[in-house]
Amino acid sequence: MDRIQKEASVEELNGIFSEAGSVVMAHYNGMTVAEMTELRAKLRELGGTFKVVRNRLAKIALQGKPGEGAADLFTGPVAIAYSEDFVAAPKVLVEYAKSNDKLVILGGFMEEDVFDAAGIDALSKMPSREELIATISARLMGQASQVAQRLMAPAQGLAGAIDVIREKADA
């Protein structure tokens, strides 16, 4: 890899580290091409990416960035998984690591917060952005319908009273 390619790689990593919701680092030693392809496909389904990186270039790209504390994790054969959704990459990697002991999660970062493997595991158990939005909107809609019912109750009671008076007048 010549200097120009290295500079381009550092620029690409700068963009990844700046724009990703979360970045997870993992050792992939011993994984077959088929296993890595399967992992990449699972990540792609959730908008994530799995990329093998050169440690020295990743450390250079992290200098002065919010996730700079995670630079120590770049030792040995390291790949990064990242996604815009801050829980997508951790969820897929933790799930995949349970079934494949060749993938070892080292840690990761989300903005300024650096996590070890246990932190990534905890992050993977959080609901995704879409799940949070669905939960919040369901709660808001439930409360809105309760308010509407309470506002309509007096009018419904008045309509019922008018019907009773009309029935008595007709009889």
Curated annotation (Swiss-Prot):
CC annotations in GO: large ribosomal subunit
InterPro entries: Ribosomal_uL10, Ribosomal_uL10-like_sf, Ribosomal_uL10_bac, Ribosomal_uL10_bac_type, Ribosomal_uL10_CS_bac
The keyword Ribonucleoprotein is annotated on this UniProt entry: yes
Origin: domain of life: Bacteria
Keyword field: Ribonucleoprotein, Ribosomal protein, RNA-binding, rRNA-binding
CDD domains in alphabetical order: Ribosomal_L10
Keyword Secreted in annotation: no
Record GO terms (molecular function): large ribosomal subunit rRNA binding; structural constituent of ribosome
One GO BP annotation of this record: translation
Quaternary organization: Part of the ribosomal stalk of the 50S ribosomal subunit. The N-terminus interacts with L11 and the large rRNA to form the base of the stalk. The C-terminus forms an elongated spine to which L12 dimers bind in a sequential fashion forming a multimeric L10(L12)X complex.
HAMAP family documented for this protein: Ribosomal_uL10
Free-text function comment from the UniProt entry: Forms part of the ribosomal stalk, playing a central role in the interaction of the ribosome with GTP-bound translation factors.
Family: Belongs to the universal ribosomal protein uL10 family.
NCBIfam families according to UniProt: PRK00099.1-1
Protein name according to UniProt: Large ribosomal subunit protein uL10
Lineage: Bacteria, Pseudomonadati, Pseudomonadota, Alphaproteobacteria, Maricaulales
Gene it is expressed from: rplJ
